[in-house]
Regions:
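Short flanking/linker segments adjacent to small metal-binding domains or redox-active Cys/His motifs
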Residues: 80-83, 336
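Nucleotide-activated chemistry modules centered on ATP-dependent adenylation/adenylyltransferase
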Residues: 1-72, 88-385
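Short, glycine-rich nucleotide/cofactor-binding loops
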Residues: 72-81
Length: 385
């Protein structure tokens, strides 16, 4: 982190991101990347060409789904993005198979939201239950490693469960809730790549105690070669094809599906709520709301002043955060005192452990080159992985 504080003049990202940089006008690297990568995609949404791309995509999914029970796989967590994805695909006549990955941390509200989604939309649901002892040990390993992204064990399992289900059910499309309108900004230092299996295994090898025999994993080659090339599975970020505003999405799913709000982004998980609202700000000085709100600023849903006002409020009530800390410690099988000791350890970064960061960087550059060659406006915003 820089000793000299600076905040972007366009969004609200600042030097709490140790890898941020600013141009001569004070515009940050995240904003510049959004202008290069995100804005062309979002400006295409709703245009005649964009509408045609969406219609063609839906038609292709229906054609590939002929003779099968389902056209696509979707993940459901009870959160806004995944709930709106379920609504969007179902109202367009697609037959999704919903997959929920139960890592042991669902809030009651998340469970109720999922029940409402699948019931009201008449969607089949598969629940993938992760072995708790392995999940607990892996999450503890990340706390012992003193890394910023202690949510990797959950996020990696979610991803692996989607691909496993698509492959086992012979479903050629995974429709995800990742999107540029609300998620274009996330510093790598705050949330290193959950898809990096080499990194996950390196952390567990050093600090874990329970063998990962049933925990679902997804390696680089399997994700970017075996599944898309050998099995023909394509990942579709459908919200990048739609006009997507967080506030409008919440209103629609409340009215149509009986969805109930759970607070902050990804707070449907008790662990993630504690991780984002307590662990990251206290231990690292990272407040992920800054990235989430900056994403809404650059996409035009919020003004910069509105985002700054939101940052002036606590991420979650203090009393509830302390209750969450006790709950997380107890569920992980350690005392609050031992948990406090782990939280007080000197911080490390993902660079302190083996990873495939160079390989993912090469992949990203190859994708960027391909998009430039094929002209993004012709190929649409679909992603390969």
């Amino acid at each position: 982190m820089s000793d000299r504080y600076q905040i972007c003049v366009r969004c609200i990202m600042d030097t709490s991101d140790p890898e941020i940089d600013f141009d001569a006008e004070g515009v940050c690297s995240h904003c510049r990347r959004f202008e290069e990568v995100g804005r062309p995609v979002l400006e295409r949404v709703g245009t005649p060409e964009g509408k045609r791309s969406l219609a063609d995509l839906v038609e292709r999914m229906k054609e590939r789904g002929q003779g099968r029970d389902y056209d696509c796989v979707i993940g459901v967590s009870g959160g806004v993005d995944s709930t709106y994805v379920a609504y969007a695909v179902k109202t367009r006549g697609l037959r999704p198979l919903a997959v929920h990955c139960d890592t042991g941390w669902n809030s009651e509200l998340a469970v109720k939201n999922i029940e409402n989604i699948v019931t009201r939309l008449d969607i089949d649901l598969r629940t993938f239950v992760v072995d708790w002892e392995e999940m607990r040990d892996l999450q503890l390993a990340f706390f012992k490693a003193s890394l910023a992204n202690c949510d990797i064990p959950q996020d990696h399992a979610f991803l692996a469960a989607l691909y496993r289900t698509a492959a086992s059910e012979r479903i050629p499309f995974i429709v995800t809730g990742s999107n540029l309108a609300t998620e274009s900004i996330l510093p790598r230092a705050w949330g290193y790549n959950a898809g990096d299996l080499r990194h996950l295994r390196a952390v567990h090898r050093r600090f874990g105690t329970v063998p990962l025999r049933r925990y679902p994993t997804l390696g680089f080659v399997r994700r970017y070669f075996y599944y898309p090339v050998m099995r023909g599975i394509r990942t579709i970020p459908i919200l990048d094809y739609l006009p997507y505003r967080k506030s409008d999405a919440k209103r629609i799913i409340r009215e149509e599906l009986g969805w109930r709000d759970y607070g902050g982004k990804h707070y449907e998980s008790i662990f993630t709520r504690f991780f984002q609202a307590y662990y990251l700000p206290r231990k690292f000085g990272f407040d992920k709301r800054r990235a989430h709100l900056s994403s809404l600023v650059v996409s035009g849903e919020l003004t910069r002043d509105e985002a700054l006002r939101e940052m002036g409020t606590p991420p979650h009530p203090q009393k509830e955060l302390l209750e969450d800390k006790e709950y997380v410690a107890k569920k992980l099988g350690i005392s609050v005192g031992e948990f406090e000791r782990l939280l007080a350890l000197p911080t490390r970064t993902y660079r302190d452990f083996p990873s495939s960061v160079a390989l993912f960087g090469l992949k990203d550059r190859a994708v960027a080159w391909y998009r430039r060659r094929s002209r993004l406006r012709e190929s649409g915003p679909a992603r390969a992985g």
